[in-house]
Amino acid sequence: MVWFKRAKPAIRTTDRRDMPEGMWWKCDECGAMLHKKQLEDNFYTCSECGYHFRISPYKYFSLLFDGDKYQEFEDQLRSADPLGFTDTKKYLDRVHDIIEKSGKTEACRNAFGEADGRMLVVSAMDFGFIGGSMGSVVGEKIARAVDKAIDLNAPLLVISQSGGARMMEGAFSLMQMAKTAARLTRLSEKKLPFFSLMTDPTMGGITASFAMLGDVNISEPKALIGFAGPRVIRDTIKRDLPEGFQRAEFLLEHGFLDLIVHRRELKTQIVRLMTMLAP
């Protein structure tokens, strides 16, 4: 039995306003909530712990090239399906779906422009496209980036962000390891520097080919760099791995890297290296 009925609500609430999608990001490392504008101002790194979020090739281009002015090249290349590969879906259907949903056309973008007034060629990988895996198109793009650097008499920077070779292309993907490594010798013959920047993650056939062949090997902080993943290694050798194994700091300590560079310092460091090594 209801004894009384409130005539008017005692507490007034405003209608809930939905938060704009993507306005707040959560740091995967420390859990801090970061506003999108704060992230952009800090080059997509956490202001609390320094964690580096994965970013697209275009964000690296904007960071590196003067006035965000650059020219992209070889963007018309598309993946083929030499094996007619099918797992849960056809390989070409998978590629088509990713292109439709994301607008990305491959796991690598090439561009050239000026960094502090000096010409620079950049080939940047994108983990958001099939894990940044290297198939025949990615290998060809990196090879053509080498050719462009030679044509422009400019240094080459390759930014790795990949899980390894693209297994859906079988031996064609593995061939790219030898192809990219061999093409880089042309840069060496022309005495043009090759800078390799490894970001999280740089794994598998990428590490085993061009990523470790830089005249200067650089990494972002705490990037995972290796061939097989730590879990696979641990399960194979039946031993615990050293703390920080396969992280950038561990590799720097053991001589596999030359520099670890915070993203906000990346352009400054690349320009400094160009000044020292470029013709």
UniProtKB/Swiss-Prot annotation:
Pathway in which the depicted protein is active: Lipid metabolism; malonyl-CoA biosynthesis; malonyl-CoA from acetyl-CoA: step 1/1
Zinc finger (C4-type) in chain: 27-49
Swiss-Prot/TrEMBL catalytic activity: N(6)-carboxybiotinyl-L-lysyl-[protein] + acetyl-CoA = N(6)-biotinyl-L-lysyl-[protein] + malonyl-CoA
Gene Ontology MF annotations: acetyl-CoA carboxylase activity; ATP binding; carboxyl- or carbamoyltransferase activity; zinc ion binding
Chain coiled-coil ranges: none
Listed GO CC annotations: acetyl-CoA carboxylase complex
EC number(s) stated in the UniProt entry for this protein: 2.1.3.15
Signal peptide: none
Pfam families the record matches: Carboxyl_trans (PF01039), Zn_ribbon_ACC (PF17848)
Binding site for Zn(2+): 27, 30, 46, 49
UniProt cofactor(s): Zn(2+)
Cofactor note: Binds 1 zinc ion per subunit.
Domain CoA carboxyltransferase N-terminal: 23-279
Keyword annotations of the record: ATP-binding, Cytoplasm, Fatty acid biosynthesis, Fatty acid metabolism, Lipid biosynthesis, Lipid metabolism, Metal-binding, Nucleotide-binding, Transferase, Zinc, Zinc-finger
GO term, biological process aspect, one: malonyl-CoA biosynthetic process
Entries under SUPFAM superfamilies matching the protein: ClpP/crotonase
Compartment(s): Cytoplasm
PROSITE patterns membership: COA_CT_NTER (PS50980)
Family designation: Belongs to the AccD/PCCB family.
Described function: Component of the acetyl coenzyme A carboxylase (ACC) complex. Biotin carboxylase (BC) catalyzes the carboxylation of biotin on its carrier protein (BCCP) and then the CO(2) group is transferred by the transcarboxylase to acetyl-CoA to form malonyl-CoA.
Subunit organization: Acetyl-CoA carboxylase is a heterohexamer composed of biotin carboxyl carrier protein (AccB), biotin carboxylase (AccC) and two subunits each of ACCase subunit alpha (AccA) and ACCase subunit beta (AccD).
Protein name per Swiss-Prot or TrEMBL: Acetyl-coenzyme A carboxylase carboxyl transferase subunit beta
Lineage of origin: Bacteria, Pseudomonadati, Chlorobiota, Chlorobiia, Chlorobiales
